[in-house]
Each structure stands twice: as C-alpha cells, then as structure tokens.
Amino acid sequence: MLVLSRKANESIKIDSNIEISILEIKKDSVKIAIKAPENIKILRSEIYDIIKEENKKSILQDKNNIHKIKKLFDYFSK
C-alpha cells in the first residue's frame, strides 16, 4: 500500500486517467474529488460492503432455489 500526504488543493494522479483531489480538510473529515472514466466504479467502502453482502445472500438464495427446482423436477420425472 502506498501512503501519501496531501494538503488542500493538492491532488494525486493514478495512471493517466484518474485524479484524486483534496478539496477540504476539516477536524475529522477530508473532502475529496475523484475524476475517472465512467467505466470505473467508485463507491464508498461501506456501500461496497453492503453490495457485497447482498450479492452473497443472492447467491445463497439462488443455490437454495436451484435445489428446490431439482427436487420438483425429480418428483415430476418419476
């Protein structure tokens, strides 16, 4: 992991197409701006974690549904 220090109105470039700018620094928060191509997804980590958990639940539900459908198929195939 690369750790950098930046002041307000300074920025960081990632590759040639992503720029992270420090807009404002307050006592307990930092306001940033991110310029990136539209195909790059940018999410707050807490939102990303919620989406990840919901996707896991969905996969488990799909597996459960597939098992139920198989049982129905087996029942009607007799």
From Swiss-Prot:
SUPFAM superfamilies: CsrA-like. Keywords: Bacterial flagellum biogenesis, Cytoplasm, Repressor, RNA-binding, Translation regulation. The keyword Cytoplasm applies. One of its GO terms (molecular function) is mRNA 5'-UTR binding. It is found in: Cytoplasm. GO terms for biological process: bacterial-type flagellum organization; mRNA catabolic process; negative regulation of translational initiation; regulation of bacterial-type flagellum assembly; regulation of carbohydrate metabolic process. One of its GO terms (cellular component) is cytosol. The keyword Glycoprotein does not apply. It holds the Pfam family CsrA. Homodimer; the beta-strands of each monomer intercalate to form a hydrophobic core, while the alpha-helices form wings that extend away from the core. A translational regulator that binds mRNA to regulate translation initiation and/or mRNA stability. Usually binds in the 5'-UTR at or near the Shine-Dalgarno sequence preventing ribosome-binding, thus repressing translation. Its main target seems to be the major flagellin gene, while its function is anatagonized by FliW. Belongs to the CsrA/RsmA family. PANTHER family: CARBON STORAGE REGULATOR. This is Translational regulator CsrA. It comes from Borrelia duttonii (strain Ly).
